[in-house]
Amino acid sequence: MRFEGRVALVSGAASGIGRATALRLAREGASLGALDRNEAGLSQTLREIEALGGKGAVFPCDVSESGAVARAVTASERALGPVDVLANVAGIGDTAGAEGIEDLHDERWALVLAVNLTGPFLLCRAVLPGMAERGRGAVVNVSSLAGRSKSANAGPAYSASKAGLLGLTRHLAYDYGRRGVRVNAICPGGVDTPMIRAAGVSQAPSPEEAELRRKRIEAYRYFMPIPRLSSPEEQAAAIAFLASDEASYINGVALDVNGGLYMA
C-alpha cells in the first residue's frame, strides 16, 4: 500500500472530496487525521475509516482560525505522529458577486478568502517545517477551474481565492522542493458534492429551487467534453497520486481534473 506507515492530515474531511480523500488515503495504509468544522460529518468519516480497518482520529477545526489550526495539528501529531501528507481540501463556494461585484460585501469577501486561501496557508505553515526537517513530505492543495480562469457559478471571491492558492502552491513548491517536500495542486471543475448541489439554493429548497438545482446539474453534460460531473472519488484518486511516491518528481504542478473543461 502506497501510504503504509505514513500519517496524512486532510481538511474538509466531513464530506465531499475531503471525505473521499480521507477514505482513499486510509484504504492505502495511511493513519488519517481528519479536520472539519462539521463534527457529525467527521464522526461519519471516522466510522467509515474504521470500517475499512484503517486508523484515524478526528479534530474539529475552523481552518480559517490560526489558533484552531495550531491546536488541531498539535493534537493530530500527538495522536498519530508527524504529518507526512497534507491535503488541503476544505473550502466554501460562493455566488455573491457572480452577477456584479457590487453585490459582494466586505464580510463575504473576507470569509471566502479566509477559508479557501488563509486556511491552506495556516496548515502549510504548521506542517511544512517538520516535513522539511525530516526531509520528506507531500502537500496537495485543492484549487479549482475557477483559479485557472473563472467560475461559471461562483463569484469573484471564489475565483480570487482559488487563483491565490495556485500562487501559494508554486511558491512553496520552489521553497521546499530542495528540502524533500513536494507541493502540488489539483483543479477540479464540476464535482458532485454537497457544495455544488447547494449552490444558490436554501437548506430546505422550495420546489422551484429544487428544479433549479436539477437543471444546473443537468446542464454540465451540455458544455463539458466529458459530459458529466466528476465524482469526489475521482478527485481523491488524483490527490492520492500526487501525494504518493509515484509522483516523486512532480512538484509545483496544477493538475486539471475537470474533464477537459480547461485545456492548457
Range-by-range predicted roles:
Residues 3-33:
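Canonical Rossmann dinucleotide-binding motif of NAD(H)/NADP(H)-dependent dehydrogenases/reductases
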Residues 98, 240, 251-264:
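Short C-terminal tail/terminal secondary-structure segment
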Residues 124, 161, 169:
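Active-site helix of classical SDR
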Residues 129, 174-175, 248:
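Alpha-helical segment proximal to the catalytic Tyr-Lys
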Residues 144:
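Residue(s) in the substrate-gating loop at a strand-loop-helix junction
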Residues 177, 182, 250-252:
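Short, small/polar-rich loop/turn modules that mediate ligand/substrate recognition or access, typified
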Residues 97-101, 105-110, 220:
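Substrate-binding pocket helix/loop in short-chain dehydrogenase/reductase
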